[in-house]
């Protein structure tokens, strides 16, 4: 059987087995990251870029009055600076004396109307939402749009790997 045929079979099985897959992968609340970097809408863009760089994350939910109002990524913050230096990195951009970020706020550059998830959603539903909207992370919010965490692609991979490890054992080969 070809690798492509196996891949198609896997996708077909996944679609037909969605209720089982939902049960196995669990909920967004079980998979999400709870210790999340949050950026204030009125924070300077320069400070936001420094914070993302320092925390080693590529993006974060944006909050205003305790509610998620957007999402911002390093890319969103770097685009204005690329006009100065197309090869710029966050560290070099922040070291530059004439950064185009000066005077800009997170709210000027963020993606508004963020796609969000809820803790009770199945991970499968959240992944579908990520794919449909072309995003890599979903802020997880309560009914009042207050942040509870974030679900990232890495969180999804961990959920799948956890399921795979549980199903196939620890991954060690006992046949020496």
Go through the PLM ranges and name each one.
Residues 1-176:
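Tandem CBS (Cystathionine beta-synthase) repeat/Bateman regulatory domains
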């Amino acid at each position: 059987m070809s690798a492509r045929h196996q891949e198609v079979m896997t996708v077909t099985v996944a679609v037909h087995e969605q209720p089982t897959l939902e049960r196995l992968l669990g909920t967004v609340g079980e998979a999400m990251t709870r210790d999340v970097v949050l950026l204030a809408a009125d924070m300077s863009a320069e400070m936001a870029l420094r914070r993302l760089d320092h925390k080693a994350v590529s993006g974060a939910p944006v909050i205003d009055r305790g509610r998620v109002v957007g999402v911002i990524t390093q890319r969103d913050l770097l685009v204005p600076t690329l006009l100065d230096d197309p090869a710029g990195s966050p560290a070099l951009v922040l070291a530059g004396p004439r950064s185009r970020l000066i005077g800009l706020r997170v709210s000027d550059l963020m993606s508004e109307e963020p796609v969000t998830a809820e803790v009770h959603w199945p991970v499968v539903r959240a992944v579908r939402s990520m794919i449909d909207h072309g995003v890599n992370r979903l802020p997880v919010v309560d009914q009042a749009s207050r942040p509870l965490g974030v679900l990232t692609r890495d969180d999804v991979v961990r959920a799948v790997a956890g399921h795979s490890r549980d199903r196939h054992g620890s991954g060690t080969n006992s046949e020496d």
